[in-house]
């Protein structure tokens, strides 16, 4: 039996999230259907991070076990031939059985693209979040950065956890939150050991509330310490959220994600 790691991009706007569901309009269902058509047998996939409906991925990682022997590029080209245009494998890598897409990951990274202009932009519909402000108004990005600083380190993130979250522990380590201001756009990068269900979207809701001056930056620390979801802002829209990277031990040379063909081209190139 051979274990293969696969890298996946997808535009999540048209799908009901990653995880397989009875109606079968999920990324996992489309991917496993395509793999079955390529391999001639149903193969189950294990994913690094399950994404919600409307959430995208530039660096999703999965693994599967198979007796089929093919060159890595044959997996990419062959499976992609049966996938819808909004889902595509980017690479394939043979790994040993010690590799696990979910449990071996020690860091995950999400980006969020937020448009703050006075009107919608149809060309990025479904691919960016919105906080439409009147002409001349801007989010207070410095206040957002000050609020985000309270999130760094190991914390109980229960205040930002969805009620249906199945994680065994709400304690996670946030390594970095980087916020870039670019005209009508605000781009955010979150790096953590792992994320709870809806955690990034709930953090976004709070950061935007601070950016709109509804709360001071220290409010974020109060919400975090309160460990109560009711204290935080409403869950922000999924449209601008992207899973961009998953890190593994050096023994597994998983390719880094390439955001160059997305809204994030060049945005975080100089970020540590």
UniProtKB/Swiss-Prot annotation:
Function: Formation of pseudouridine at positions 38, 39 and 40 in the anticodon stem and loop of transfer RNAs.
Annotated transmembrane regions: none
Name this polypeptide is given: tRNA pseudouridine synthase A
Subunit description: Homodimer.
GO MF terms, alphabetically ordered: RNA binding; tRNA pseudouridine(38-40) synthase activity
Annotated substrate binding sites: 110
Catalytic activity: uridine(38/39/40) in tRNA = pseudouridine(38/39/40) in tRNA
Protein family according to the UniProt entry: Belongs to the tRNA pseudouridine synthase TruA family.
Active site: 52 (nucleophile)
The entry's keywords: Isomerase, tRNA processing
Enzyme Commission identifier(s): 5.4.99.12
Lineage, top ranks: Bacteria, Pseudomonadati, Pseudomonadota, Betaproteobacteria, Burkholderiales
